[in-house]
Design a protein with these regions (language model features):
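Internal, well-ordered alpha-helical segments in soluble enzyme and binding-protein domains
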Residues: 182-185, 220, 224, 242, ...
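Soluble non-cytosolic domains of exported or imported proteins
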Residues: 49, 76-80, 95, 177-181, ...
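Short glycine- and hydrophobic/aromatic-rich loop-to-beta-strand nucleating segment
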Residues: 127-128, 269-272, 276-277
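C-terminal segment of classical bacterial N-terminal signal peptides
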Residues: 22-32
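Secondary-structure end/capping motifs
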Residues: 279-397
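Conserved C-terminal helix/tail region of periplasmic/extracytoplasmic solute-binding proteins
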Residues: 364-466
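Bacterial N-terminal signal peptides that target proteins for export
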Residues: 2-17
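Short, glycine-/small- and polar/acidic-enriched structural segments
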Residues: 34-217, 227-230, 234-264
Length: 466
């Protein structure tokens, strides 16, 4: 594995000396002649989370090199900075929260047209609470063989919230961004337990705290453990390694993984601006090819490469956390309370289960949650949800990259969805509340929730109307 000394990482195609290698490169060059790269030097952004792994692997294993790309990978301070830099063109593309480009399309926050042709990971998040909150939750949780029965539901928090309210204290929890997966998942868990996470009412009120019983606010992922340890928040939802970091530091307990909350949900995507994608179609496809190979490598042969992947991620220019902390979730296990380590082989999924394919239904689910909590503060037709998903998710580009890899002998047709794939997953009730999601009927889905907007309801003047 190549050692890098700087936060900005750069690599170029290696010139091979042997005649055989020269012949191979000449052949590759003739094949690529019809698809000349519009841009060879790229700068890609990420946030320090383990699910940025496909970017690190594509760099370290030379997959970007194979596509003729010179790539810099650069850590960003937070999701807003990252998103705005993609919009401005300072970054060619980036690791993004799955709902982030959808927020751009609907105009919640920065208005922008971002597209995604690659899902970077399924699952990979958890909800962690402070030791004090855990101490109060634990007596209400069923036990088996001396350990808590999972999944743990949010209704165990209700007596604690009542106590905080009686004492005049807010119950503060953190997520990473308003139009982010962690916000949607934390809200889902709380509401499934009968706890209101609050409404948005844009453009007047974008706090998301209207009517909230638990107060949610933004904290950048690497700052989550320290912010909780300081007492500013009592819990958070974030990706790894920042839940396992709380376990290792002895400051908190992850109470539920998102795999238990909603199985195999799209967590991160790779996003570029639509203008960039339109201007650089061949370069875009080349990037997706490299990322597909990286995701295949990460999930190959029952995760046999994960230890090497963890070594990459532990380097300071990537995630920079201790090897043991990252390995705790990347290698098919997950530690809840200290010493309570359990098998969770699909905590991080990069390729299996068609994990890297950009399903419209994943986008539609996130849009339903934006509507549920008022980020979309008006009723929309079922057709609108699919139309909006198609503005962002581009399975056509993904499959073009996949077919190129198949033609090159780097993948098999059976590795990918068939040509008949619609981009809509079958209805599923793999959620903590058992409510089935059918992406073809988003409004009917929303009407199933006890907490949240439905039908023609809107939030006005701090109240739900309609």
């Amino acid at each position: 594995m190549k050692k890098i000394e700087y936060l900005t990482i750069k690599r170029r195609v290696t010139v091979l000396a042997s005649v055989a290698a020269f012949t191979a490169l000449s052949f590759a060059g003739s094949v690529m002649a019809a698809e000349k790269l519009e841009k060879e030097s790229l700068k890609l952004g990420f946030i320090k989370l383990t699910d940025m792994a496909p970017l690190a692997v594509a760099f370290e294993k030379g997959y970007f090199d194979d596509e003729g790309l010179s790539v810099q990978i650069e850590a960003q301070a937070n999701w807003k900075v990252l998103f705005d830099r993609v919009v401005s063109g300072e970054l060619d593309g980036a690791h993004m929260l799955a709902p982030l480009p959808l927020g751009g399309v609907i105009g919640f926050g920065t208005k922008a047209d971002i597209v995604s042709a690659f899902t970077m990971t399924l699952n990979g998040d958890a909800i962690t609470v402070s030791n004090d909150v855990w101490k109060q939750m634990k007596p209400q949780i069923p036990m088996q063989d001396g350990k808590p029965v999972h999944p743990i539901k949010a209704d165990t928090l209700k007596p604690i919230l009542e106590k905080y309210k009686a004492e005049g204290k807010p119950f503060n929890m953190a997520m990473t961004f308003p139009v982010g997966s962690h916000n949607m998942k934390l809200r889902y868990w709380l509401a499934a337990g009968g706890i209101h996470p609050g409404f948005y009412a844009p453009p007047q009120d974008t706090s998301g705290q209207i009517g909230a019983e638990a107060i949610l606010s933004v904290t950048p992922p690497p700052q989550m453990p320290a912010t909780m340890d300081s007492g500013t928040i009592v819990g958070y939802c974030v990706g790894e390694p920042w839940n396992q970091q709380a376990v290792f530091k002895g400051i908190g307990v992850p109470v539920i993984s998102d795999y238990e909350l909603m199985k195999n949900s799209a967590e991160k995507i790779f996003g570029v601006s639509k203008a960039w994608a339109d201007k650089n179609p061949n370069t875009h496809k080349a990037v997706i090819k490299a990322l597909i190979r990286a995701s295949m490598w990460l999930d190959a042969e029952a995760n046999k490469n994960r230890n090497e992947g963890v070594e990459m991620l532990s380097q300071k220019q990537y995630v920079g956390a201790d090897y043991e902390v990252i390995a705790n979730s990347m290698n098919g296990t997950f530690e809840y309370e200290k010493g309570d380590k359990r098998p969770l082989p699909d905590f991080n999924v990069f390729f299996r289960h068609n994990g890297s394919y950009p399903y419209y239904s994943d986008a539609i689910w996130n849009l339903t949650q934006m509507r549920r909590w008022g980020q979309i503060n008006e009723a929309k037709s079922d057709a609108w949800y699919l139309e909006t998903a198609k503005k962002v998710y581009r399975p056509d580009i993904y499959m073009a990259a996949a077919k190129a890899l198949i033609a090159e002998g780097k993948a098999k047709a059976s590795d990918f969805p068939s040509d008949s794939e619609t981009g809509i997953k079958p209805p599923s009730a793999d959620f903590i509340d058992g409510i089935s999601f059918d992406a073809t009927k988003p409004n009917a889905y929303l009407n199933n929730f006890k907490i949240g907007l439905k039908d023609k309801q809107v939030v006005k003047g701090g109240k739900v109307v309609g």
